[in-house]
Amino acid sequence: MLNPSLAPLHDPLRLEIDYGTPRREAAEVVTLSIDGLAVTVPKGTSLMRAAALAGVNVPRLCATDSLEAFGSCRVCLVEIEGRKGYPASCTTPAENGMTVRTQSPKLKDLRRGVMELYMSDHPADCLHDGAHGACELKQMADLADVREVRYNAGAQAGANVGAAIGANHCEAAKDESNPYFTFDPAKCIVCSRCVRACEETQGTFALTIAGRGFDSRVSAGQDQSFMNSECVSCGACVEACPTDALQEKSVILLGRPDRSEITTCAYCGVGCGFKAEMKGSEVIRMVPWKDGKANEGHSCVKGRFAWGYATHKDRITQPMIRAKITDPWREVTWNEAIDHAASEFKRLQKTYGRDSVGGITSSRCTNEETYLVQKLVRAAFGNNNVDTCARVCHSPTGYGLGQTFGTSAGTQTFKSVEKADVIMVIGANPTDAHPVFASRMKRRLRGDGVNAGAKLIVVDPRRIDLVDSPHVKADYHLALKPGTNVALITAMAHVIVTEGLLSSDYIAERCDTKSFHDWREFVAKPDNSPEAFETVTGVPADQVRGAARLYATGGNAAIYYGLGVTEHAQGSTMVIGIANLAMATGNVGREGVGVNPLRGQNNVQGSCDMGSFPHELPGYRHISDTTVRSQFEAAWGVTLEAEPGLRIPNMFDAAADGSFKGLYCHGEDIVQSDPDTQHVAHALSQMECVVVQDIFLNETAKYAHVFLPGSSFLERDGTFTNAERRISRVRKVMEPLAGLADWEVTVKLSNALGYPMHYTHPEEIMQEVAALTPTFAGVSYEKIDRLGSVQWPCNEDTEEAGTSVLHVDHFVRGKGRFINTQYVASDEKVTRKFPLLLTTGRILSQYNVGAQTRRTPNNLWHSEDRLEIHPHDAEDRGVHEGDWVGIESRAGQTVLRATVTERVQPGVVYTTFHFPESGANVITTDSSDWATNCPEYKVTAVQVMPVAQPSTWQKDYAAFNRRQLDLLDQAQHPAEVMAK
């Protein structure tokens, strides 16, 4: 326990100690004396950190333990017995036998003089303003006993008398261009922490120190505003600033928080830990949690700042019902809404049969909520017609890794990338979709000054940021044609096999011999060579050979992949091909290697783990397994159907045919996110009872008959599971605006359907999951609260915190299984009518269908979906930057503005899908993965031409949307509507 009087600097609100410099890992330790206290630390530890570990606070300004030591502020000086001078404790390593003093009359005088210089160029009221409780400069001034400043610089005199020694920073204008934070140069002491955070933590290098001496200042780019610079608004600079020169606008507007709660971000699959800092019942800011294993104190613009949607005026907080989708909504009580939904589902099953209804779970909801929805479908509906949005993103990951390795999850932790020598990124754009992990990856690619950076292979049709940015460049960019992934991965395997680059000992020990021999014979065929596939993929054979050799021989090689792998007609085949490559080179089962799917949403992994697929119970156990099924039957007190139920696309087809009549859609917007929008909308219009549980009237809810208000991540308790199988707590920081958390709504619906559920807290739900699921047997809230997080498998056979690396001694299935990957061309081929290939993706500032981020200031960066088109293709069509262009496929047509760019290759166009009015999925088709029905979002044959007006679909959508909003308005504001 630290002596409070000596405790290192920390913000009492956050209860996180800042040790001044980063932790060092070393087998060798050293022992020294600091102010008479003996302390033992790993070799390489700074004196500042050693002192902090001993409970001694060495004053400092430029140092923080999230950044490498810089040694510029001269406040952290110490005395070392037997040495001359006063070295900086942040840059001086601890040595055996050292005797160090951090306090002496001389050190006090030195620090006081330095602090007076800082304060002379700082607002005078900072010394006396109690509101600046978190300002480290004020704390350091107090420690140095600085109450007044002897130097009469302009900052203190309030005039231009400081001009003789440099610019008067106190007269510099604030930069308030960023919607989330301000930069006040008057408070800046040019400690460079913000600059170093932008470089070391984020890797954007958007900030710099301009000028020299007293004229030095922090500059965003070439003296640009933050908003107009390359700043990505991750918040690292704000977090690093010791003086409130960089500060959240929410703090300025609402005041400083008075309490905090640790929770988990509800955006992407990185699963960043945050502290929700509150004032009363109001969220003031979200601060990245230093001890969060997934993010280690870093954040992105979405998680750090874009949480305001939780209290947006569009939130629906009253249950609503209506008979037809053309009727006005009617606000009702919770009991009336639940009873109505239950009676409708019962009526449909009595009229059309037990299998006429089903449910869809959401990857935005907690494990506990998802578990309850699939349980409701199986136990209350009595069928297996349950599916999840993972169907349309990472279902091929589950199939492919399950077939080859034996379990449906990535093999590594995010931290593992720090030990990779070769990184291969396939069909993923981490800087936009997984930015916090991307920053960690970029640090490894840059190197640390001692160790060289890792080599990088990028496989992507577009020139994503990782291909060529100021500080990271790919060694190989394999810019393949969309839809040819399997041809490329098979060609790489051909090189590894035919050039003798296999890890023979690993294969002999760890893999199935027969499957390996069959695979080796298959890939060695001349038809699978890079030369044979060159015209198919569009990638020069020598590039494929070079990349394959690098992956096989470059040391620890790690593969990270995204939806550019899975969302194809051969998505499952490609996942298998990746697994083959990793096994063939021995790159599974230790740190720095592995096969790592970058999951798109916050709980995609968890929604699959919880049994959301129609053929699997929790823990990826098949519904047809009598032993497994009997365990759940005994626990749930029902007889379960042994046959798998309908997948999401099957539900739509059955609805269009008239046999599927009711849907419980929990937290998922299938109209905007699923392919072939017009088919999905038609299917919903044919159903007699669509129940949507969400926080906004999303596109799917406009086809609903019952609306059950959901809760945001700030209003719920539970857990999320991220892309590294890490289970983290989600903690309620405010009461549900609608009065009930999502799990409570599902419990009430199940009870009304006749299947009783008696949970009183999500912890009880997780206890049931742990009791029924071997891989979760050791998971508990108590353990997560104590350790911060755990990783499944977590049971008696693992460490207490679970399993960081899978398949260490053997694969989950026993022996790794090789499977042949025969390339089959996509049905989406270019023709005279449709000569271009469309692929889709995301952008940094927006998230998925945009329901959350569109209701935040993130729209300032990206307020519409645009179509990227290569200059050659644009010129051929007479298209210029910003022109409206029509995009037509065999499924439909929409209109977007054009962005003419060389990020895409000739023959390829690209767009995002964040805005419903864009209709990006109006033009994606019904083509899907052969094994899982995952849609082929990444390959659609299209034509692009200049147009002068919106498409027919967009006109119809605009009219339908206006009508639905009017019907909502009639329910929410009946008196005002009547008056009009």
Per-segment meaning from a language model:
Residues 736, 740-790, 857-868, 872-980:
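Long, contiguous, secondary-structure-rich segments that constitute the structural scaffold
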Residues 45-49, 93, 366, 647, ...:
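Short, structural beta-strand-to-alpha-helix junction motif
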Residues 123, 191, 252-716, 749, ...:
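Catalytic alpha/large subunits of respiratory electron-transfer oxidoreductases
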Residues 414, 715-736, 745-754:
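Glycine/threonine-rich phosphate-binding loop and adjacent beta-strand/alpha-helix elements that clamp
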Residues 2-19, 74-233, 238-264, 279-282:
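Fe-S ferredoxin-like electron-transfer domains
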Residues 607-608, 613, 762-857:
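Long, low-complexity segments enriched in small/aliphatic residues
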Residues 39-96:
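N-terminal cofactor/phosphate-binding cores enriched in small/glycine residues
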Residues 32-33, 96-102, 223, 472-480, ...:
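Short beta-alpha connecting loops at secondary-structure transitions
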